[in-house]
Regions:
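Single conserved hydrophobic/aromatic residue that forms the stacking wall/gate
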Residues: 213-222
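Helix-rich interaction surfaces within compact, conserved domain-sized segments
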Residues: 186-194, 199-201
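Glycine-rich, mobile lid/loop segments that gate access to catalytic sites or pores
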Residues: 1-91, 95
Length: 222
């Protein structure tokens, strides 16, 4: 989505920037094959989570993808998880990434830590979780707006705290088909698929030596 971006200059070398040539090559690769690449690729390269106390206690995140089919109805989600808060599994509620202790031996609870800030507090504001859902259902622009709104429930299920003044979250919805589906079913399914994509972003992310500045990802610490 060309109208949205994440702030990732605090991770790795801030002088490394994407170019028009990189964008052109990314489009060519996207159309050339069907392999899905997730984790630290594309917009997920510098994504991190758990940044209530800045980058030193954060963890690596990335780009996540998920898709499901219900008969002939298809729904896919893609998300870059670059959140202030902690990340939780949509299946069992277990924390899978987030704010680390100062010695990085365990997790801190971002919500509990946030409750310490009784007076106005400058937070690490470089946070944006950007997601999109794409379906083959036949929906109007107004209906897609509603589906995008329902998809946001996935953020609340998987990210806590979420929608803070330090977050700049966005969700987009697009229709590329003509399958007739109830909008309530579609929006509910979109939230489920987005939650899976958020989890996928965490599980497939890993640190890259050339970009090392902050914390390991869950994949590197297992």
């Amino acid at each position: 989505v060309c109208q949205s971006c994440i702030y990732d200059l605090s991770y790795g070398d801030p002088k490394i920037r994407p170019t028009a040539k990189m964008g052109e090559e990314a489009c060519r690769q996207a159309f050339a094959g069907t392999d899905t690449r997730t984790g630290n690729i594309g917009a997920g390269t510098g994504a991190t989570v758990g940044k209530l106390y800045g980058m030193k206690q954060s963890m690596k995140s990335g780009l996540g993808i998920a898709a499901v089919s219900v008969k002939n109805f298809q729904m896919a989600a893609i998300v870059v998880v670059n959140a202030l808060g902690d990340i939780f599994s949509p299946q069992n509620g277990q924390k899978i990434a987030g704010l680390k202790t100062p010695d990085r031996s365990g997790f801190l609870d971002s919500v509990h830590e946030l409750y310490r800030f009784m007076t106005p507090h400058d937070q690490f504001t470089g946070n944006t979780t950007i997601g999109a859902v794409i379906t083959n259902g036949a929906f109007s622009k107004a209906e897609l707006n509603k589906i995008a709104s329902m998809t946001r429930c996935a953020y609340a299920r998987c990210i806590n705290p979420v929608a803070t003044m330090a977050d700049g979250d966005s969700i987009y919805a697009a229709s590329i088909g003509d399958v007739s589906v109830d909008i309530n079913m579609a929006g509910t399914l979109a939230a489920e698929v987005m939650a899976q994509a958020i989890q996928n972003a965490i599980h497939t992310s890993r640190i890259q030596d050339c970009l090392l500045y902050t914390s390991p990802s869950p994949r590197d610490t297992r």
